[in-house]
Amino acid sequence: MADKRFFGTKTFPNQEKALKAKIMNNDAFISWIEKNLGHRPKDPALFLRAMTHPSHGNSDYQRLEFLGDRVLGLVIANWLYDLFPREPEGKLSRRLNSLVSGASCASIARIVGLPQWLRLGKQARDDGAAASDNVLGDVMEAMIGAIFLESGIEAAGKLIHKYWAPLVTGQESAPKHPKSALQEWAAAHNRRPPVYEIVSRTGPQHNPCFTIQVSIAGVGEASAEGSSKQEAQTAAAQALLDILAQ
C-alpha cells in the first residue's frame, strides 16, 4: 500500500463529507469499479473525485491524474524494458510515448465503460467533454492514481497490464512518430522540411479543437484536427504521409 506520508491527498472536511454521502449508497458505481478495474474501493469518495471534471466543482481529478500519469509511465517503461531487452533507449521511448498518449488512455477508458460515470458541469457536458480524448485520458489516469493510493504499485500495475497488453503486444516494431517520418521523407527526397500552420482553434477551453495544415513545398499538403496542437500536427503529418504513399 502507498505510504500516505508521501502520497496522501489533501481533503477538505465539508467537501469530503458531501462526496462520501453521494457515493456510499451507489452500489452500481462500486460494483463497476470492482468488476472492470479489479479493485474494491476502501474510500469510494477517492474514486468519485477521480471521476469529477474541474467544471463540476473544487474537488476534481487533476491531482489524481498527475499521480496516475507517473504510475502509468513507470509501469509501462518497466514492462518495455523487460520485454525488449535489445532495443535502444530511442526505440523504447517511441513505444512508451505511443502507449501512454492521451488517445491510448482514452481508448482504454472507453473499453472499461468509464464515460457513463463522468461527473461534468452542465456546460462541459453540453460541449461534449464526455467524448473528449483529453478528458477521458485524464480520468483514466486519475483512476490509476486512486488505485495506487489505496493499494500500491502492484494493484495499479495489474490493471495496466490487463488493459494495455493488446497495445503493447500489438507493436511489432517501435512506432516511428509521423512528424519524424515526414521529416525524413522530405530529407530523403531533397525537399525543404515540412511546415506546420494553425488553421483554426475552436471549442471551449476544456475541450479545444485545433486544425493544423502541414505542407512540403512543391509536394503537397494535408490538414487534420486534434484536441491539442501536438495531436493535430501528428494527425496532419500522418495524413500527408498517407497521401505520399499512394
UniProtKB/Swiss-Prot annotation:
> Which InterPro entries does UniProt cross-reference here?
dsRBD_dom (IPR014720), RNase_III (IPR011907), RNase_III_dom (IPR000999), RNase_III_sf (IPR036389)
Task: Write the Enzyme Commission number(s) for this entry.
Answer: 3.1.26.3
Q: Does the keyword 4Fe-4S apply?
A: no
Residues forming the DRBM domain are 177-246
* Active-site residues per Swiss-Prot or TrEMBL entry: 69, 141
Metal-binding among the record's keywords? yes
**Top-rank lineage group of the source organism:** Bacteria
Q: Name one GO molecular function term.
A: double-stranded RNA binding
Task: Tell me which cofactor or cofactors this protein depends on.
Answer: Mg(2+)
Q: CDD domains given for it?
A: DSRM_RNAse_III_family, RIBOc
Write out the entry's keywords from A to Z.
Cytoplasm, Endonuclease, Hydrolase, Magnesium, Metal-binding, mRNA processing, Nuclease, RNA-binding, rRNA processing, rRNA-binding, tRNA processing
Sites binding Mg(2+) sit at: 65, 138, 141
Gene Ontology CC annotations of this record: cytoplasm
A Gene Ontology BP annotation from the UniProt entry = tRNA processing
Q: Where in the cell is it found?
A: Cytoplasm
Q: State one Pfam family annotation.
A: dsrm
Domain RNase III: from-to ranges? 30-152
Q: What does this protein do?
A: Digests double-stranded RNA. Involved in the processing of primary rRNA transcript to yield the immediate precursors to the large and small rRNAs (23S and 16S). Processes some mRNAs, and tRNAs when they are encoded in the rRNA operon. Processes pre-crRNA and tracrRNA of type II CRISPR loci if present in the organism.
How does this polypeptide assemble, per the annotation? Homodimer.
Family the UniProt entry places it in: Belongs to the ribonuclease III family.
Please state what the protein is called.
Ribonuclease 3
Encoding gene (name)? rnc
